[in-house]
Amino acid sequence: MSSKWTLEACFSYVFAVLMFIGMHYFQHNQGGSGLELPFNLVVWCFTSLLIGLGLLKVSHSQRLRYNRSLLVMLFSTILLWLPLLYPNAEFGEFAIDRLLGLSAGILIIFSIMQLELSRQHWHHILYFILAGVLIESIYALVQLYLLTQGNWVGFNVNATRAAGIFQQPNVLGTFVLFGLLASAWLISEKAVRSKLQQIIVFGCCFFAAWAAIVSGSRTVLIALFALLPLLFPYLKNSAEPHLLRGWLICIALGCLAPALPELLNDGVARDAIGGETTAYRVTMLKVSWELFKQQPFMGWGYGAYDGIYHNAQAAFNAQGLIKGYHFNVAHPHNEIAYWAVEGGLLPLLTLLFLAGYFIYSIFKQTWTKACFHLGLLFPCLLHTMTELPFYHSAIVWLLFCFFVSKIATEAEGLCTKPFPAKFAPKVFAGLIPLFTILFMLTGLQTIHHISTFERTGSSDVSLLEGIINPLPMLSRYEFDAMTFRLNAASKLHLSDELKNYLSWSDSLMRRKTRTENYYNRIQAFKALGLTKQAEQTYQQALFIYPDTERVSFRYIFAMRTGEKALQAYLIWNKQQLKDKPDAALYIHQINGLVLLGRIDEALRVQQQASQRLPNELKLRNIPSLKPYTEPMGSS
């Protein structure tokens, strides 16, 4: 094989296409995480090719390259699969996707270690990372400052935070920090020589810092200002002084840049730091801790977190034990808490052991190099303690695995062992990309069909019937299909079909607590004439989704039931507000009035609410009223 087309060179080329094009793929979707987001499916297509190249290298060289860190990670991954065998893992199938993603990450690290990537190859990879970050940073700034109403990507121009392709501002913030990390690595290895390279590095630092600030993520801000002191001691000893100064100056200018558009727009600021989320995170952690204490040894079962959380939260809220009520919680926004609640002590101790060993291994180097390596991983590690970046973004997970592989190799070196099996690695090198790409491309078709189905009134069932591979969105696919059958059965009075829906929803309600699940179940009971069961379900939904919270089942039920029900709700709502003012009740009333087209009344209620509750910022910034309160032509 010519030097131009070595496996290492092909690895760089595939990675380059991913960072320049693949990761930025856009397709309309209905939100979510993991494989529900189209760009993640495309990233996994490229990732499978990268894994395949690593396995092909094993076949060609007939050698295995590894170190102790890789063995520890492999052993830890096996341990994390074991709770699937627990007797309480009723919903374990819904944890398989994250276990497969974790295992794929180990395969990525393994594949990178097999390839004999030279310093030049690694520098190219870092520059490709800079390119990807630069593209996303500029795209995020375009979203925030240049896009107009009705843009084809569907970005809400009233939003105060940019999200890039990720549809989640905090994930954008963590991703763009990779630009600062990659540039720091480049200048530490004196790989920034030409003027063009300096322009790329400094330009990326400037725009990445700007995008990080406008992402409005407190986690990202903490990570940004914590990683600098971690990186600086090693950079001071290894980087050329003028490059280090330029690096720091560009980051500082990027952090200051968001103030410039505000100064040019007569001081009209766009507040990037959005609503109060600290109380929500504290609540999730507090509820998770209580759940862990109740089942510390075997946990509540993989895949069960969503169902058990909301009932526990409602019970604690009724007792006045928590502040900050949260909804649609499928993850506690803390990775350790997630595994501990679902799997108990084994996953918890495994993760702590893995983290402890890795920190121990890198601190066998000089303290400046160890702090530098820790700083390279710090933004992602911090983010996993406050949210779920690896679930929202496959590219963040991939880059994290890249960094782990390189750091582990620098800290411990690599051992080489003969591996005479030549055929098996070559077969898997072909099969893994083949099946992954087929799965992900049919997944993109699934996303398109389900998005079209839901956006066009959920009435054209042929869209669901035309889906080839429902697995990437299996829960949503099943819900849409069963809801369509429920609606048809209600109209045609098909009692057997209605009972079939209730039987199916029994398991769903224990696994996933959502307002739409309660609503459908109530409709099924009513259609069967089971008014007592319908009322019991309604009361349970009110318990899970109280009236004075952001998500109120009473309001949602009225909104879905029809105009008369909504008008009756507004009468009830006003009566409640006479006795005690409440921000959430006011917001529900205003949103209901907007839905009914009573805009002037909604504006009066907002003014009244702001006077009665002057410290409630949410009352001054209600999204449904923005089109009627902002000046013409503003964005």
Give the ranges of each region predicted by the language model:
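Transmembrane signal-anchor hairpin modules in multi-pass inner-membrane enzymes, especially those
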Residues: 1-82, 92-94, 107-123, 127, ...
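Alpha-helical transmembrane segments of multi-pass inner-membrane proteins
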Residues: 9-23, 42-55, 77, 81-86, ...
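Loop-to-helix entry and N-terminal half of a specific, functionally important transmembrane alpha helix
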Residues: 16-20, 204, 330-334, 362-386
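Transmembrane alpha-helices of multi-pass inner-membrane enzymes
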Residues: 45-48, 228, 369-423
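Interfacial juxtamembrane loops and adjacent helix segments
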Residues: 148-161, 275-279, 290-294, 302-342
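Flexible juxtamembrane loops connecting transmembrane helices in multi-pass membrane enzymes
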Residues: 227-228, 250-293, 327, 447-460
